[in-house]
């Protein structure tokens, strides 16, 4: 319930703070709420309250976060008139955006769904662990690089010459950080898996090919990230929706063909082939 209320009442404020370079407001609030709610939940469980009351406490703490964000926006954006008639023309590509989102949903979940349907749970477990580790690395990169995205968006819509210079610097910085972290991941991941899986015999977690495939997949994904941002800044969703659909189709088709022959390697190769197409065509 808190997620639905958050989306409907706080979503617009979150976007406003993001494009104004104040994402740290929502990030700090979310961090405090997360820690506070966990402490309260632990306290309630230790004192014998049932699960309904524990979840209700989480709901109440999240409501306090929404109230705080709303008050912050009203105080620092007093000029903002929420009673103005919405400009629906600005949302003329909403259907195209939905196509992108659905296509992205299919693309991002093809691997795990195909493995769940056509492989055993041990294979899914190995894939999920590798994916979790690489996702943590991706979160670090995003945390370091996403804080300046709003500057790029503002420059794109106000000063194209300045944007081109800024984009070149940002792309170099972004790719450099990405390659550094994924290179370290490629080197350290096998050793981590040997330590993690010590004593585990039901599944083979140590694999010489999986680190390379996972890192290759993510390097390709991050190599196109800066170009994809330009599409978002320019609002060219309709012009690129077919390419997004083709990318998902390639991933799904190749994964379904290869999963029966080489298992987990097959779905990863399918994703890599789709990324090769989209990275060159973006």
What label would you give each PLM region?
Residues 3-11, 65, 101-110, 128-151, ...:
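Small-residue-rich midsections of specific transmembrane alpha-helices
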């Amino acid at each position: 319930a808190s997620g639905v209320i958050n989306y409907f009442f706080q979503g617009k404020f979150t976007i406003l703070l993001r494009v104004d370079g104040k994402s740290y407001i929502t990030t700090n609030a979310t961090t405090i709420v997360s820690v506070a709610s966990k402490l309260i939940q632990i306290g309630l469980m230790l004192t014998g309250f049932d699960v309904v009351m524990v979840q209700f406490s989480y709901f109440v703490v999240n409501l306090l976060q929404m109230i705080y964000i709303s008050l912050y926006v009203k105080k620092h954006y007093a000029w903002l008139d929420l009673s103005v008639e919405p400009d629906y023309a600005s949302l003329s590509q909403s259907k195209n955006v939905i196509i992108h989102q659905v296509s992205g949903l299919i693309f991002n979940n093809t691997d795990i769904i195909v493995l769940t349907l056509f492989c055993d749970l041990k294979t899914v477990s190995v894939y999920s662990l590798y994916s979790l580790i690489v996702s943590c690395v991706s979160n670090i990169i995003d945390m370091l690089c996403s804080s300046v995205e709003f500057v790029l968006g503002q420059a794109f819509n106000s000063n194209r010459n300045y944007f081109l210079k800024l984009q070149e610097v940002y792309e170099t910085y972004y790719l450099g950080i990405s390659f550094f972290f994924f290179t370290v991941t490629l080197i350290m991941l096998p050793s981590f898996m040997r330590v993690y899986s010590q004593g585990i015999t039901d599944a083979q977690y140590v694999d010489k090919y999986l680190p390379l495939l996972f890192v290759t997949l993510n390097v390709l994904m991050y190599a196109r990230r800066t170009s994809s941002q330009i599409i978002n800044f320019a609002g060219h969703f309709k012009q690129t929706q077919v390419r997004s659909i083709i990318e998902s189709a390639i991933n799904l088709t190749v994964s379904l063909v290869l999963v029966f022959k080489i298992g987990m390697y097959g779905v990863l190769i399918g994703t890599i082939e789709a990324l090769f197409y989209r990275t060159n065509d973006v």
